[in-house]
């Protein structure tokens, strides 16, 4: 990705005075064989996964009849994910709860980590650490996983008859129906990436221009929208899976 420079300039007398510059797109690479891997995305993703696994183990390692606060919280999250899955997928939602739950929790914690974890204090030879969902590679990977999931759901339920949906309700819509399946992962990935990147850029620019206390309301708004984006992604993933199993909607 080319370096994207966003500069805010103020006209002073005869020239422009640069107040703030924010660069996005520099990466720290690991060379693995003949491949270059975005190291900072892997590092932050591993941290998020460790947080999720550690929290789950601590909360439910010793289940109680009268649940503790941690166990109660995770049971609430599980019930919430089950409700979302059942609403969007229908009666056969059960096998898809782990997939939808994993998507929701990974995206939710990734988004919040961008605002709550001090990634910037860890210095890298190139680039800087940020939320995993701040990188287009992560959001595209999540969207492609979703695409693979709804194709698998449709084929496992209907076999090759799944592809008959492309000519419903009329064969004239064949190109549009095919295009729809290709645009779903694009819309999922760019919606999530754009919202998280824009939120972090706004906070960085405000912090560089005004005292820290001023951007705090924007940071709280970012936490709220980050949670909403995780819910939207998981809900759409469940809806696509339900649609592929039920037929043309």
Curated annotation (Swiss-Prot):
Transmembrane segments: 40-60, 97-117, 136-156, 201-221, 222-242
Main location, first listed in the record: plastid
SUPFAM superfamilies in the cross-refs: F1F0 ATP synthase subunit A (SSF81336)
Gene source species: Arabis hirsuta
HAMAP family associated with the record: ATP_synth_a_bact
Annotated protein name in UniProt: ATP synthase subunit a, chloroplastic
GO cellular component, one term: chloroplast thylakoid membrane
Keywords, alphabetical: ATP synthesis, CF(0), Chloroplast, Hydrogen ion transport, Ion transport, Membrane, Plastid, Thylakoid, Transmembrane, Transmembrane helix, Transport
